[in-house]
């Protein structure tokens, strides 16, 4: 009898994607983050679905409904903590996944990479609108500050901002539509993730050496399924430790106070995973310039394939590029720290220097390093 998983129309797709998929034999734990992101997405959709059953998207009751979930709903506190900290785990995996792509030259699969950048932007949008929903002080003021950036767009800016708000300020209409966006976007992310995977399966996975692995492939199951299961177990363990022992450590204390349009918090700042971009936004003393720099800090990922100058794909055997890569990582950590600090010296100048070096590293130094390494590899005799 012919194996059903190889003949059934639906099972065949699953078989080619997760069972008989030929995978390079040498991919390391850095290749686990794709499956971890899938696990994060499933956790977020499930916990979000249960939260949506009890949440009300009205300015008068939103804050109370979140308190009601935590106090009165069976395991509501756990569902809420898993959802809030699940977002942090999601972004941690995303940043590591993107970092892996840059280090090992995975961006040369241009279609997969571009869909990945669109996915990153969509997840960031989802997280932003979701952060507004509890209607705490930082939710409200974060929404006010970030949506206000639209008004920097010449000519249509103010109209656009008021269109997004559904009025003349962040209010009931804004909260209702943000809830609608937050509900629909994860399903769009799921669809994009499937497109991302289908493009990846057109070429096959990259590997740490950056060399074509076609001559040495192994089946995905059982070798990488068991490896992914281990990754998911470690992810769940970390998430549970965070959600059970320190659920509020990554949040903002201002969000324990209901939104008050008449009282501005002393330091308005987003969640930790947006701080690097927020620092770049604040480092430019001009509103439109700041907005453009904020957009450029993410959209720069789209041109990374065009900036690849090295003859080798991966950074595994490129020490100069490796050094610059880790300087870039340190730079992003510095930006994250600066984003959480008040706007005063010395933080202003550190933020400006870090923002400048971020763009300098990606646009100038890393392409030059690739060219230098090509030159060093040429025989000199």
UniProtKB/Swiss-Prot annotation:
Subcellular location: Mitochondrion inner membrane
Pfam families: Cytochrom_B_C, Cytochrome_B
Entry keyword GTP-binding: no
UniProt keyword list: Electron transport, Heme, Iron, Membrane, Metal-binding, Mitochondrion, Mitochondrion inner membrane, Respiratory chain, Transmembrane, Transmembrane helix, Transport, Ubiquinone
UniProt xrefs under CDD domains: cytochrome_b_C, Cytochrome_b_N
Binding site for heme b b562: 83, 182
Membrane topology: Multi-pass membrane protein
Transmembrane segments: 33-53, 77-98, 113-133, 178-198, 226-246, 288-308, 320-340, 347-367
Binding site for heme b b566: 97, 196
Any one annotated GO CC term: respiratory chain complex III
Chain sites annotated for binding a ubiquinone: 201
GO terms of biological process kind: mitochondrial electron transport, ubiquinol to cytochrome c
Cofactor-binding details, from the entry: Binds 2 heme b groups non-covalently.
Keyword Iron recorded: yes
Subunit structure comment from the entry: The cytochrome bc1 complex contains 11 subunits: 3 respiratory subunits (MT-CYB, CYC1 and UQCRFS1), 2 core proteins (UQCRC1 and UQCRC2) and 6 low-molecular weight proteins (UQCRH/QCR6, UQCRB/QCR7, UQCRQ/QCR8, UQCR10/QCR9, UQCR11/QCR10 and a cleavage product of UQCRFS1). This cytochrome bc1 complex then forms a dimer.
Role of this protein: Component of the ubiquinol-cytochrome c reductase complex (complex III or cytochrome b-c1 complex) that is part of the mitochondrial respiratory chain. The b-c1 complex mediates electron transfer from ubiquinol to cytochrome c. Contributes to the generation of a proton gradient across the mitochondrial membrane that is then used for ATP synthesis.
Other notes: Heme 1 (or BL or b562) is low-potential and absorbs at about 562 nm, and heme 2 (or BH or b566) is high-potential and absorbs at about 566 nm.
Family that this chain belongs to: Belongs to the cytochrome b family.
Name of this chain's protein: Cytochrome b
Species of origin: Murexia longicaudata
